[in-house]
C-alpha cells in the first residue's frame, strides 16, 4: 500500500502530478479497494476515499486529498463523502473509536489555486482570495478553512487545512521530508 506522495497526487484527467515529493505515504485509494473486496458488499454504491495517509514521527496522522481541477459544489459534495468513507475505512483497519481518532487525525485538501480563483471559498459564499485568506488567518490567529470543510474540524478530524500547492509544501512537506531523512 505504500507509495510516494507524488504518485497519490496524480490527476488522471489532466495527466499531471500536484507534487514531486518522494515522501512515502499509504495509498488510501488502494486501501479503499482492499476494504471494498473484504466487505463483499452487494450494494451498487462504490466507496470513495482521500488520496493518501501520512503518519508523522510525532504520531500525528494526515489524510491528504489532492484536487487539481476546479472546485465546484459537486466537488465539495464529493469531498464530504470522501471524508465520511475514509473515516469508515480507517476505523476498519485501525480499530479505534472516533474520539481517539479525532485526537491525532488531520485532514489536508491541497488544491490548484490557478483553477480556483473565482470560486466561493467558504460556506458563506465569500469568493476565494489568497490575500483575504492570509489577512483572515493573521487577524484571527487561526486557520481559514475553505469550501465548507470546517464542518469536519473537531467532528471527525483534529484539524482541517485547505492549502494551495505552495502553502502545502511550505507548511508541511518540507518539515516531513526533513523528518524522513
Label each region the model flagged.
Residues 68-117, 124-125, 138:
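Catalytic cores of nucleic-acid endonucleases
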Residues 174-181:
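A hydrophobic membrane-anchoring alpha-helix module
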Amino acid at each position: 500500500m505504500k507509495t510516494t506522495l507524488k504518485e497519490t497526487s496524480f490527476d488522471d484527467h489532466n495527466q499531471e502530478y500536484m507534487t514531486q515529493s518522494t515522501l512515502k505515504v499509504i495509498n488510501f485509494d488502494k486501501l479503499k479497494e482492499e476494504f471494498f473486496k473484504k466487505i463483499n458488499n452487494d450494494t451498487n454504491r462504490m466507496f470513495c476515499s482521500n488520496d493518501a495517509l501520512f503518519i508523522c514521527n510525532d504520531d500525528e496522522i494526515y489524510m491528504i486529498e489532492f484536487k487539481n481541477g476546479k472546485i465546484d459544489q459537486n466537488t465539495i459534495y464529493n469531498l464530504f463523502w470522501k471524508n465520511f468513507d475514509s473515516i469508515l475505512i480507517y476505523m476498519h483497519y485501525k480499530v479505534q473509536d472516533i474520539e481517539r481518532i479525532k485526537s491525532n487525525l488531520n485532514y489536508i485538501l491541497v488544491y490548484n489555486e490557478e483553477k480556483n480563483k473565482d470560486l466561493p471559498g467558504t460556506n458563506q459564499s465569500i469568493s476565494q482570495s489568497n490575500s483575504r485568506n492570509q489577512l483572515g488567518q493573521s487577524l484571527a490567529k487561526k486557520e481559514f478553512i475553505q469550501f465548507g470543510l470546517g464542518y469536519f474540524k473537531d467532528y471527525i478530524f483534529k484539524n482541517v487545512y485547505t492549502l494551495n500547492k505552495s502553502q502545502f509544501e511550505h507548511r508541511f512537506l518540507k518539515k516531513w521530508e526533513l523528518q524522513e531523512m
